[in-house]
């Protein structure tokens, strides 16, 4: 099995530091198959989404996970952790895989499965129009604005409730 790894958003020095932390000797890494892309503009990012067969980001923290929605709109099955918002976008065993721990072997097996089994790509392709409609930047921006407007409308109600709850009542 031969694969190439494209790392976007990471600086080479950060990758080398991470390898050293894990006691992997930098000189043992096949740098011919690892491409450190750094920060990409949207046009370049589109090129790489179109080049890849799977999107993998088993992040320790991903508050919203919009990057998974973005990858799905390009027809890419996704691999992420079963934490935070990743499970909102990835349906385990259907549109990708959710990994539970930090086991590199588990990650490698899931990558192999997603790359070898066409059902993942077929399912993402089947849902692609829905992803494009529901996760367009306009639609996401509308949702975020809606939540912010609701919070703004409701803030006085919550502040009053909080004040009522925390204010001591006179007993004399």
Each model region followed by its residue ranges:
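Short alpha-helical donor nucleotide-sugar binding micro-motif in glycosyltransferases
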Residues: 39-40, 47-52
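Short hydrophobic beta-strand element within catalytic cores of glycosyltransferases
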Residues: 77-80
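Aromatic "clamp/platform" in nucleotide-sugar-dependent glycosyltransferases that forms part
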Residues: 60
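A short, well-ordered alpha-helix in the C-terminal region of glycosyltransferases
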Residues: 119-134
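Conserved small/polar residues in nucleotide/adenosyl-binding loops
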Residues: 165-172
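Nucleotide-activated donor-binding/catalytic signature segment of Leloir-type glycosyltransferases, i.e.
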Residues: 9, 18-40
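Conserved acidic donor-binding segment of nucleotide-sugar-dependent glycosyltransferases
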Residues: 92-93, 97-104, 113-118
């Amino acid at each position: 099995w031969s694969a190439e790894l494209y790392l976007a958003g990471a600086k080479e020095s950060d990758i080398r530091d991470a390898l050293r932390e894990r006691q992997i000797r930098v000189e043992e890494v096949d740098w011919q198959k690892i491409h450190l892309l750094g920060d990409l503009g949207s046009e370049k990012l589109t090129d790489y989404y179109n080049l890849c067969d799977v999107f993998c980001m088993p992040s320790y923290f991903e508050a919203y996970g919009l990057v998974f929605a973005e990858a799905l709109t390009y027809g890419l099955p996704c691999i992420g952790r079963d934490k935070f918002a990743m499970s909102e976008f990835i349906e385990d065993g259907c549109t990708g895989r959710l990994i539970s721990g930090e086991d590199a072997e588990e990650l490698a097996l899931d990558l192999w499965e997603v790359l070898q089994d066409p059902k993942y790509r077929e399912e993402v392709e089947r849902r692609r129009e829905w992803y494009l409609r529901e996760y367009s930047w306009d639609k996401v921006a509308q949702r975020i604005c809606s939540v912010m407007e609701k919070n703004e409308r409701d803030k006085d109600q919550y502040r009053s409730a909080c004040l009522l709850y925390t204010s001591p009542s006179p007993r004399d």
